[in-house]
Amino acid sequence: MQLSSLTAVSPVDGRYAGKTSSLRPIFSEYGLIRFRVMVEVRWLQRLAAHAGIPEVAPFSAEANALLDSLASDFQLEHAERIKEIERTTNHDVKAVEYLLKEQAAKLPELAAVSEFIHFACTSEDINNLSHALMLREGRDSVLLPLMRQIAEAIRELAVKLADVPMLSRTHGQPASPTTLGKELANVVYRLERQIKQVAGIELLGKINGAVGNYNAHLSAYPEVDWEANARQFIEGDLGLTFNPYTTQIEPHDYIAELFDAIARFNTILIDFDRDVWGYISLGYFKQKTVAGEIGSSTMPHKVNPIDFENSEGNLGIANALFQHLASKLPISRWQRDLTDSTVLRNLGVGIAHSIIAYEASLKGIGKLELNAQRIAEDLDACWEVLAEPVQTVMRRYGVENPYEKLKELTRGKGISAEALQTFIEELAIPAEAKVELKKLTPAGYVGNAAAQAKRI
């Protein structure tokens, strides 16, 4: 059976293939091979640029052009050739080396130094840098733009609905009023904190040999400052952060940090998805219908909040994967074991489920329509929420047991506007204070919620 969106085992490459296509050049097998080739090529160029390695003279413009084309314009046919070589070698990184030697043979200048391809490297030197480059491209070109798009979409909604008063609910019960925009602004602030942390995670790399001590490097060129050269390569050539202390593997702590930060963003988005789902259920939001869509196979009237439900489900899967990778990858027996290898092949899966979720949330946000009448009805039915300001003013003027008196009047039961007005009139407080309290309505008792929403 041929692989297609219908036959793929994972919905990431099946049902949701169209939503995850931007990740294929980055996190696929092709993507990993592409980055391995880039690292190998740049390492060879780094050796040629080093005055302490005379056996690899500085490359000509022609040689650098050939190498640059391999690194920056890597073709699918090259990856297919590497997989063909791997069927013989049964070693994926060695197959990359052999492909590069084949390409180097096209130019005598490069053919003469082909044994310096993969010089002094262990496979993990190439792999760890490739993984860091994959994560950087996936984060910067796909993940962060979508994260920012979500925060901006919610921000626009928050500002638009800044002045819409709404009944709060704590423990599911009526509480002091807020505005719908302010509750959305809370989400924006939380999301943007995590976006900043995701963007700020340093992506680490190493190229220090089989156990992290430059053993092979120093045996061949003891006079070269290999640590300085490695730092220049990783930070100057690749734009990553140099990790000076490793075993055979870069310990992956930064991957745990990155995935934990993405998972926190996802957790906040789950909270948002559930809250909006609840507001739709209460009737505070209506959803724009799409011609031809069906909400239920048996109930024709249904317009379900499926986008927020899809988002919540995919975010849960993503976070489960991130949690496993973040807890497993920093652990490796002694100088290394191979348990990280198969796990690292799943770097893009949690990110894929995340972007599926982000697209679903954005689609859901785009369908939302305010039902102002329904929100106002709920608020006007809960005059008991004004017990808080009344008892607070009573405290100011020294009325005994203000909390207890309001508790007796309101706890567990609704009260009318008239009943509250009568209670206020009988209070032993200044007349002007009574006037101000009588002006209060649930819709007007929102503090500075609107101002907070507008400045987000």
UniProtKB/Swiss-Prot annotation:
It catalyses: N(6)-(1,2-dicarboxyethyl)-AMP = fumarate + AMP; (2S)-2-[5-amino-1-(5-phospho-beta-D-ribosyl)imidazole-4-carboxamido]succinate = 5-amino-1-(5-phospho-beta-D-ribosyl)imidazole-4-carboxamide + fumarate. Its EC number is 4.3.2.2. GO terms for cellular component: cytosol. It holds the Pfam family Lyase_1. The active site is at 171 (proton donor/acceptor), 296 (proton donor/acceptor). GO terms for molecular function: (S)-2-(5-amino-1-(5-phospho-D-ribosyl)imidazole-4-carboxamido) succinate lyase (fumarate-forming) activity; N6-(1,2-dicarboxyethyl)AMP AMP-lyase (fumarate-forming) activity. N(6)-(1,2-dicarboxyethyl)-AMP binds at residues 15-16, 90-92, 122-123, 248, 297, 302-304, 310, 336, 341-345. Keywords: Lyase, Purine biosynthesis. Pathway: Purine metabolism; AMP biosynthesis via de novo pathway; AMP from IMP: step 2/2; Purine metabolism; IMP biosynthesis via de novo pathway; 5-amino-1-(5-phospho-D-ribosyl)imidazole-4-carboxamide from 5-amino-1-(5-phospho-D-ribosyl)imidazole-4-carboxylate: step 2/2. NCBIfam families: PRK09285.1, purB. Homotetramer. Residues from neighboring subunits contribute catalytic and substrate-binding residues to each active site. Belongs to the lyase 1 family. Adenylosuccinate lyase subfamily. Catalyzes two reactions in de novo purine nucleotide biosynthesis. Catalyzes the breakdown of 5-aminoimidazole- (N-succinylocarboxamide) ribotide (SAICAR or 2-[5-amino-1-(5-phospho-beta-D-ribosyl)imidazole-4-carboxamido]succinate) to 5-aminoimidazole-4-carboxamide ribotide (AICAR or 5-amino-1-(5-phospho-beta-D-ribosyl)imidazole-4-carboxamide) and fumarate, and of adenylosuccinate (ADS or N(6)-(1,2-dicarboxyethyl)-AMP) to adenosine monophosphate (AMP) and fumarate. This is Adenylosuccinate lyase. The gene is purB.
